[in-house]
Amino acid sequence: MKQERRFGDYKSEAEAWITLATGEYYPDILPDACRLYEPVLVEFERLLKASHSSTFLFTSIMETQNQWMRTQLCRVFKKYVSPQTPVEMLKRKTDAAKVCAQFGAAFRNVVEVQQKFDSRPMPDEALCAVLWEYKDRGKKGYDLTERLFDLLRSQHARLVVTGPERAGKDVLLGAVFKDYPKPDRPVDFVIYNGKTILAIGLARYDSDRGGAQEDDRTGQYREVSQEIIGYADSHGMPHVKVIYVNDGPGLLLGSMWNDYAYIEDQWPGRVKVVTLRMVPDRITAKWLRS
């Protein structure tokens, strides 16, 4: 009987098993980027001219009603005024006072901001190109989950696969398992046979990853595996599996492949790490139901 290949066994031919998302060429993006973001720069200029301080400018941005415009204005503010402020904090209206208290003293002076802004053309191609990079952030991950769901549903027509296929709220394990110790633990998909939970899954596309980010991802995976399997075993569900779907060229960087192989080998038969191309061969009905 042929022995099933483990994730680590694919390493010698790893390039053949990853899926590459298509990108966009520079400088071809510039006309579209300038068309999209020139209104943002015009609005930033208007708010800047009406501001007597950088703190007032930030407060004015936070009062912008349109969420998309507010987010883009925050990104421009970060570049010109406060590069040290986390953009996620800048985007939340409820954090406005906290941002001013924690980072306001380091905001660049509004007069200097005006001078720097006026020194750039309108539209500023360089800044528009930077903003364009944010536009599709997360899109590759959404594409991955959408294709994954299509694969799983075509391969396992009698099973139910739930979770956000593109943008949407993650599945929280507190809504999947009763009395789960970390109810706010987010996962990307759950596979059911009727009402029986067969597998919990996470899916990620790694365009470029290494160093601390690499350590963070694999550390999180070890923690999630231990947590889910520990809960399942203590609640009479030794059949529950954990699936990590990872794809993209980031898998080829550093020790990523070996680290994922190690995670799979720690829980043989219970945890599998796969790329999209491995799903048909490795995520079988026999394994899911075993």
Where do the language-model regions lie?
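Acidic-basic catalytic patches of nuclease active cores, encompassing PD-(D/E)XK
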Residues: 24-28, 32, 124-175
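Conserved aromatic-histidine-acidic binding/catalytic patches
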Residues: 61, 65, 132-140, 209-213
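Short acidic/polar alpha-helix capping motifs at helix-coil junctions
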Residues: 110-116, 150-156, 227
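Catalytic core segments in nucleotide and nucleic-acid processing enzymes
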Residues: 159-290
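Nuclease-adjacent, charged terminal/linker segments that flank catalytic cores
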Residues: 1-121
